[in-house]
Amino acid sequence: MVKSEPKKKPQSGGFFQKFFRKPEKSQKEQRLTVQRSIPYLEMGRDGICRVEEHLYSKTVRFYDINYQLAQNEDKNTIFESWCDFLNYFDASIRFQLSFINHKSDMSEYNKVIQIEPQHDQFDDVRMEYAQMLRQQLAKGNNGLVRTKYITFSIEAKSVREAKPRLERIETDILNNFKVLGVKAYPLNGVERLQIMYETFHQEEQQKFDFSYDSILQSGMTTKDFIAPTSFLFKSGKDFMMGDTYGAASYLNILAPELTDKVLAEFLDMDKNLVVSIHVQSVDQLKAIKLIKGKITDLDRMKIEEQKKAVRSGYDMEIIPSDLATYGGEAKKILDDLQSRNERMFLVTVLFLNTAKTKQELDSAVFQTAGIAQKFNCTLNRLDYLQEQGLMSSLPLANNLVPIKRALTTTSTAIFVPFTTQELFMEGDSLYYGLNAVSNNMIMADRKQLKNPNGLILGTPGSGKSFSAKREITNVFFTTTDDIIVADPEGEYYPLVEALGGQVIHISSTSKDYINPMDINLNYADDDNPLGMKSDFILSLCELIMGARDGMEPEEKSVIDRCLPLVYQKYLNDPKPENMPTLGDLYDCLREQKERQAQRIATALEIYVNGSLRVFNHQTNVELDNRIICFDIKELGKQLKKLGMLIVQDQVWNRVTINRNSKKNTRYYIDEFHLLLKEEQTAAYSVEIWKRFRKWGGVPTGITQNIKDLLASREIENIFENSDFIYMLNQASGDRQILAKQLNISPFQLSYVTNSNEGEGLLFYGNTIIPFKDKFDTSLKLYSLMTTKPMEMGKYKEKKEA
């Protein structure tokens, strides 16, 4: 693998670049192989690289946080913490920030969203949904992988001497990232080699195949596994790696001030790109001495100019503007170093563009240069330093480019390495739209959260019920989870029926019955299922009696005494026909002597023998279908809250059964605020909310009435136990309440202000992502999921026809 290397041409630099430009070393030997061009000596299994004879480095990968979407106060905190992070590095440590955008094999992403046909009656909608996912993936940039690294190097006589110090620096870096709320981890040797392999093969799809055992078996070196077929540095402005064209450039910072969006703009490009920021701290005393020396030089030049002015007969205060500018800049830097906790850094910002053709390369470089110009900077090609630029773009923390710019801590920190978080998980992940900032697909697995409980919040017409149905559809196609829906508005039956589920219509005229007294032997953690069931019966009776402040202790005691008597027959012989009903509890209460028992029985009478006796029957519907929808739309006002509470208890029964089968249960509660509005049902609902997680339940509350929801005393418990919130458009008053409750920044709040249908904010653990989800209205699935009255009417007409 032979390469061509022409002579080098000097490179020009700015005022401060001239101060710190190193003389170029003469090249003693002509490198004849690709491997010898790669500038490191050894790469250890543990990730420690011997770069030069006495130079060793390690690399840490770090992930993004939501900097661009943060509140100004939070932005300032992040920025100040990032300044502290930079100030950690003393003059003995070189470090390099690497930002790599490279195209990935789309097949890896397709595997995550793949839905295989099952050759059943659902294949038409299943394949339709799969096609929709592929179309959404194509809209984004998920095929472009963005990774971020920090590499640090120190000088040492041997690896034994270097290792403990590198590990100590690594620990400090990880702790500093932790302060910033940034996830990070150190790379091993294979992972570091893979980065270099991908840098040298950016336009290729072949995967990196390497293990340290391969070296022992083949006798090759690590460089043999990462090197391209050839390097060609014939031109002074670009080069070739194998069949790939490349160009290395540096950022010439001309602007007096930069915005913290400058790096984000470069990284937002949808092309292969490597941005490397090499940073070398200058010893504080040396930096101050150096700047004082430059000020002295400038003052001397100023005096000479003034003498010249006097001799020429014009005002001695008139001096060259550059001299005044440089003098002011130098004095400001000195003040920063002496009194503002600033350090001085020597910084080199490099860009590596690659492409399959020369035309594509020129286009990519032109686009990159355009962004630089937008921020009053210039992107200059490294004339006859292309090899040094390429090799300095490798994460080795060894800068071979002799062009450096002196910057203070604050000026260096303006290259904030954080933009917006992405969420694309493997496993049982579900689709939640596209990232509104990056346009990348959002795939997340709620079951990976500490608390998978969730809320879907939005104004009427914002798409909250549609979003719930889309998740239900996704769950049905990609998991084995059971799905239960509490449907107070009769909106879910078209989808449930289309997926082969069971719709249970509960009303005063319906023949579908569910028994609120149903219990199974696994109803609680311990061997006493009646303990947990008692909580439900008490909540039920409180709701029936309208006891806003709860029942009296005597009343609770009477019920608690009756329950073992009522359930005795079933617990002795657990057959379905032995299951008690509300009528059995009513009869038992009538037999008690206390007046409290008679009071409770009287309250129950209308639900046992009167016009509201719909819940005084044995369950007569099968509840073992994978998808069950409890349609309680036709229940009157008196029964709706009661019905929702009873449905919730039926769900708990199902969850306890599924737990033994190691199966998850998804539970969707529309009009969730109704359960939290009454103290009686709110307390029980929160208890269920807390217990669901360890029993394999994944509940989702859906509501448009944010004020009613937040008015509940129990809402704090709901939010604390909900790590997933899908927030759509919000009314003005609700936005302010939610902003305070969830600490949402004004910029983030704009995504739920007058937003279109299917747009909003996704809260996944500590991650907040703005999303958009435009669903194709021509799909059959759309007609099954829509809740728009006119479109639902068309579905009914079509079904009846």
Locations of regions flagged by a protein language model:
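Extended, folded cores of ATP/NTP-driven motor/assembly subunits in large transport
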Residues: 2-418
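Walker A/P-loop NTP-binding active-site region of P-loop NTPases
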Residues: 462-515
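P-loop (Walker A) phosphate-binding loop of NTP-binding proteins
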Residues: 459
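A short helix-turn-beta junction within AAA+ P-loop NTPase domains corresponding to the substrate/partner-engaging
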Residues: 500-504, 714-727
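P-loop NTPase motor domains
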Residues: 65, 72-91, 98, 102, ...
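Hydrophobic anchor at the beta1->P-loop junction of P-loop NTPases
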Residues: 456
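Structural recognition of the conserved hydrophobic beta-strand(s) that form the central parallel beta-sheet
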Residues: 483-486, 629, 666, 692, ...
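Conserved P-loop NTPase
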Residues: 742-797
